[in-house]
C-alpha cells in the first residue's frame, strides 16, 4: 500500500521521459514532451531532476517526432507547432528579458523569451476572495491570448528517496514551456498528463452542504435536520465550524461527535469539521497530554507542517476524529504568505483517504500547487452583497484556466452586508448550476441561510431549486467522471468558443455547464417597474431551449430576455439528453427521468458507481448509453448498456420528449416490454417499467406538426408582464392591441411611442420597445 506521502505517484517509471525526448548539454537538459510542451532545465553543476515534485508526477509522454538543428553554440528544436532556440549552456536567470532562449509559434509572430511578462495571460484563481469588495488580484493561469505560458517548477518541493519532501537547490532552473497557440484543450491535456488528472469526488459532494458557524448543541443539529426533512429540502453534508471544540484545546470535541454522526448518517448526511492546525496546543490541555509523550515543550504547533509531525497529527488526532464519524475536513489555514504548509495539509489529508480506498475530499483555500488534485477549493469568507455575487461566476471560469472545476462559494455570502430576499434567491439559483452547492455564513440568527426564514414565496423557490439540484445529480456525476477522465471542465467560459466577446462585460459571466447546458447567471437586481430582471444574453451557435420555460432560441445572436424571481437563464441545446433522479434519496436510481430535446440528433453516456470508493478503477461501475435520432415528425430513442457491471438489476424510465405534441404512433422494439404514454403540458411522456439492465430498448415516435411553437409561450409571457405592470387597464388594452397585431415591427414601435400622448411614461415605452425586439428575435 502506498504511504500517505507518495500515494500520488502511481508509477515511478513514468517520472522518466523516453530517451529520444532528451537533448543534454553540460549545464542544460531540454526534454521535448509533446508538440506543445517542452521542459527546460539549467544547472551550473549539470545535475538534473528525475524525482517527483509537489507539482509534477509524470514526465512520460508518448514519443513524438521533432527536428533538431545544431551548431557548436546554438541549438534549434522544431516540434511542428513551435520552434525553440537556445544558446548552449548559457545561464537561464530570473529578471530581465533575454534572447538566449526563445520560442516562436510556427506560422505566427507569437514569440516567447525567458522572463516574458505574459501580459495577455487571462489569469487563474488566487488564494481566496475572503472579504474582497471589488477587484481581485488573480494568480497566473495557463490560458493566454498569446498562445503560450511558462510554468516554473524550480522552487517546488522534491520527494526524496526516503519519501520526504525537501527543498531544491536554489541554483537550478526547471521550467515547463507550453506553446499551444489556439489549442488550449491540448494545453490542458498536457498539463494534466504532467501533474495528474482531476480527482474523482464522492457523489454526495454534489449535493447541498450546510455550514453555518454556530455554536450548535447536539439537539439543535437534530432540530435543524428535522426541519430540512419536514420541508422536503435535501442536504448531504453538515459541516461544523469553530465551535465543535475548545479552540485552545485544538482537537478534543466539546460535543458528542459520535452521536451527531450517527444521527446524520441515519439521514444520509455526512459530517465534516473545520480544523486549523495553526492553533497552539498548550500545556494543561487534553491534547497536550497526548503530545507530551512524544515532544517536550510548554506549547506546540503543527505549523510549520514538517515530515516528522505527520505521524503525530494523524495518529493522535485525525484518526480519532474519523473514528467518531467525521468524513470531511475543512482546512481553515488562512495564510496567503504560506502556501507550502497549506499544500502539505491538503496533500496529506487527501492522501489519507486515498490509501484507504476512499475518494479524497477536503475543503481548502487554493495552495496554487495542482489544486485540481485536491478538491474542493473554498473561495473564503466572502461578503454578503451583489458585488460578490457578480464576482463568483467569473471566479469559477478563472478556475478553468488552471484546470479547476470544483470551487465552493458561501452561497448567500459569508459575512456582513444586508440579508435581501432577492439576493439570496439569485445566489441559490446560481448554486444550482454550479459544481458545488455550499450554504454557508458566519454564526448568528440574523444570517438567514435557513430557507424557512424567508417569505413563503422565496422559500418555495429555494425548495424548487434545491430539489432541482438533486434531480440533476445523475447528469452532474457523469460530467464529473468525464472531467476526471478527460480533463474537460464542468464549467467552461463562454469566451473559449466566442473569443470575440472576451472583453464584452455584458457576457463575461456566461458559461457552459457540462456538455449540454449553457448558463447566463443573474447577478443584478430586477427592474421594479416590471418586477423582472431585464437581461441581455448571447446564445451560442445552434438551437437552444430555455430549460425552465421551453422557449426555443436560434443561436449566434443576443436577446433581451425578461426573468421573474422564479426564472433563471439556463438553456439546453437541441438534441440534448438529460438524465434526472425521480427519487433524490437514491444513490443509484431505480427510476430515471430522461429529458430529450428535439431538432437535432443526440447521445449521452450516464456514468454510475458506488459513489464513494475507488473500486470504479477496478471495473465496478456502469455506463448506460442513450441515443436520439431526430427527423421531422419522426423520433427514435435508444437505451443500451455500454460498459461496466450491473449495479441494479432493473430500472424504470420516464422518457420526456420535450416540446412535442400531435403524436400519432408509438412503437417499441420488444413486445414483452411494458410501456405507457401520455402528454404532460407541452411534453410527450413514454414510461417503461422494470427494464432489465443490459436489455436494449428502442422507441420510435411519429407525429404531424409535432413541435410545440415558441410563439404561444412568448405570448403568454408578454401577457404576464402586462398583468404585472403598474399602468391603467385602458393603456394595457391599447398596448396589447399593438403587440399582438399583424403590423410589422417598425410600425409597432411607432404605435407604442405614440401612446406617450395618452399618458404612457417614457420608462414604460422603453420596456415595450425592448419587448418588441425580444418578440422579433424569438
Specify the residue positions occupied by each region the protein language model found:
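Catalytic cores of secreted or luminal carbohydrate-active enzymes
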Residues: 467-486, 540-624
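Solvent-exposed beta-strand/loop surfaces of large extracellular or lumenal domains
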Residues: 52-65, 546-565, 665-688
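N-terminal accessory segment at the very beginning of proteins
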Residues: 1-205, 210-213, 218-220, 225-226, ...
Amino acid at each position: 500500500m502506498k504511504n500517505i506521502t507518495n500515494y500520488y505517484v502511481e508509477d515511478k517509471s513514468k517520472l522518466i521521459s523516453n530517451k529520444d525526448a532528451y537533448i543534454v548539454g553540460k549545464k542544460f537538459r531540454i526534454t521535448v514532451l509533446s508538440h506543445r510542451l517542452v521542459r527546460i532545465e539549467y544547472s551550473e553543476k549539470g545535475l538534473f531532476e528525475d524525482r517527483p515534485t509537489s507539482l509534477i508526477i509524470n514526465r512520460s509522454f508518448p514519443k513524438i517526432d521533432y527536428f533538431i538543428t545544431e551548431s557548436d553554440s546554438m541549438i534549434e528544436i522544431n516540434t511542428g507547432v513551435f520552434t525553440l532556440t537556445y544558446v548552449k549552456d548559457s545561464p537561464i536567470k530570473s529578471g530581465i528579458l533575454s534572447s538566449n532562449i526563445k520560442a516562436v509559434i510556427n506560422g505566427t509572430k507569437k514569440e516567447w523569451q525567458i522572463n516574458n511578462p505574459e501580459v495577455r495571460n487571462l489569469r487563474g484563481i488566487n488564494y481566496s476572495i475572503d472579504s474582497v469588495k471589488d477587484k481581485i488580484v488573480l494568480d497566473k493561469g495557463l490560458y493566454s491570448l498569446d498562445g503560450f505560458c511558462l510554468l516554473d517548477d524550480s522552487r517546488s518541493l522534491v520527494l526524496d528517496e526516503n519519501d520526504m519532501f525537501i527543498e531544491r537547490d536554489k541554483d537550478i532552473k526547471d521550467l515547463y514551456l507550453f506553446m499551444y497557440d489556439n489549442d488550449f484543450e491540448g494545453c490542458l491535456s498536457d498539463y494534466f498528463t504532467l501533474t495528474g488528472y482531476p480527482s474523482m469526488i464522492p457523489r454526495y459532494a454534489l449535493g447541498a452542504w450546510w455550514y453555518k458557524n454556530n455554536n450548535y448543541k447536539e439537539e439543535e443539529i437534530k432540530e435543524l435536520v428535522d426541519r430540512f426533512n419536514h420541508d422536503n429540502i435535501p442536504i448531504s453534508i453538515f459541516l461544523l465550524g469553530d465551535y465543535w471544540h475548545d479552540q485552545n484545546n485544538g482537537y478534543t470535541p466539546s460535543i458528542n461527535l459520535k452521536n451527531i454522526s450517527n444521527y446524520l448518517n441515519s439521514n444520509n448526511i455526512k459530517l465534516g469539521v473545520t480544523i486549523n492546525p495553526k492553533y497552539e496546543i498548550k500545556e494543561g490541555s487534553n491534547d497536550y497530554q497526548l503530545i507530551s509523550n512524544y515532544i517536550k515543550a510548554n506549547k506546540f504547533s503543527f505549523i510549520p507542517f514538517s515530515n516528522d509531525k505527520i505521524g503525530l497529527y494523524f495518529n493522535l488526532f485525525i484518526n480519532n476524529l474519523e473514528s467518531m464519524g467525521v468524513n470531511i475536513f475543512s482546512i481553515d489555514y488562512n495564510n496567503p504568505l504560506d502556501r507550502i504548509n497549506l499544500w502539505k495539509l491538503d496533500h496529506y489529508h487527501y492522501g489519507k483517504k486515498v490509501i484507504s480506498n476512499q475518494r479524497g475530499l477536503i475543503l481548502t483555500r487554493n495552495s496554487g500547487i495542482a489544486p485540481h488534485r485536491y478538491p474542493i477549493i473554498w473561495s473564503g469568507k466572502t461578503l454578503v452583497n451583489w458585488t460578490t455575487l457578480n464576482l463568483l461566476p467569473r471566479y469559477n471560469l478563472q478556475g478553468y484556466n488552471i484546470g479547476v472545476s470544483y470551487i465552493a462559494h458561501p452561497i448567500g455570502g459569508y459575512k456582513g452586508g444586508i440579508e435581501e430576499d432577492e439576493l439570496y434567491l439569485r445566489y441559490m439559483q446560481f448554486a444550482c448550476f454550479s459544481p458545488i452547492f455550499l450554504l454557508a455564513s458566519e454564526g448568528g440568527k440574523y444570517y438567514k441561510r435557513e430557507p424557512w426564514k424567508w417569505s413563503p414565496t422565496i422559500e418555495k423557490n429555494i425548495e424548487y431549486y434545491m430539489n432541482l439540484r438533486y434531480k440533476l445529480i445523475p447528469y452532474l456525476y457523469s460530467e464529473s467522471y468525464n472531467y476526471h477522465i478527460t480533463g474537460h471542465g464542468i464549467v467552461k467560459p463562454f469566451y473559449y468558443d466566442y473569443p470575440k466577446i472576451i472583453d464584452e462585460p455584458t457576457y463575461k459571466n456566461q458559461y457552459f455547464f457540462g456538455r449540454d447546458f449553457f448558463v447566463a447567471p443573474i447577478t443584478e437586481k430586477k427592474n421594479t417597474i416590471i418586477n423582472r430582471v431585464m437581461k441581455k444574453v448571447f446564445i451560442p451557435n445552434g438551437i437552444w431551449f430555455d430549460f425552465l420555460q421551453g422557449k426555443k432560441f436560434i443561436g449566434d445572436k443576443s436577446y433581451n430576455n425578461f426573468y421573474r424571481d422564479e426564472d433563471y437563464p439556463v438553456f439546453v441545446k437541441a438534441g440534448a439528453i438529460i438524465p434526472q433522479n425521480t427519487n433524490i434519496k437514491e444513490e443509484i436510481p431505480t427510476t430515471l427521468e430522461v429529458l430529450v430535446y428535439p431538432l437535432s440528433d443526440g447521445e449521452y453516456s450516464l456514468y454510475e458507481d458506488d459513489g464513494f470508493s475507488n473500486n470504479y478503477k477496478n471495473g465496478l461501475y456502469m455506463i448506460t448509453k442513450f441515443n436520439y435520432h431526430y427527423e421531422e415528425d419522426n423520433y427514435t430513442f435508444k437505451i443500451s448498456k455500454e460498459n461496466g457491471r450491473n449495479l441494479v438489476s432493473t430500472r424504470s424510465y420516464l422518457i420526456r420528449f420535450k416540446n412535442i405534441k400531435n403524436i400519432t404512433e408509438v412503437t417499441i422494439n420488444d413486445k414483452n416490454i411494458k410501456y405507457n404514454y401520455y402528454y404532460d403540458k407541452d411534453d410527450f411522456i413514454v414510461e417503461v417499467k422494470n427494464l432489465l439492465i443490459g436489455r436494449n430498448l428502442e422507441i420510435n415516435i411519429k407525429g404531424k406538426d409535432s413541435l410545440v411553437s415558441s410563439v404561444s409561450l412568448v405570448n403568454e409571457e408578454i401577457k404576464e408582464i402586462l398583468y404585472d405592470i403598474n399602468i391603467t387597464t385602458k393603456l394595457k388594452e391599447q398596448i396589447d392591441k399593438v403587440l399582438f397585431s399583424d403590423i410589422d415591427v417598425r410600425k409597432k414601435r411607432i404605435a407604442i411611442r405614440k401612446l406617450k400622448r395618452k399618458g404612457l411614461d417614457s420608462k414604460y415605452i422603453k420596456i415595450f420597445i425592448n419587448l418588441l425586439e425580444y418578440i422579433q428575435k424569438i
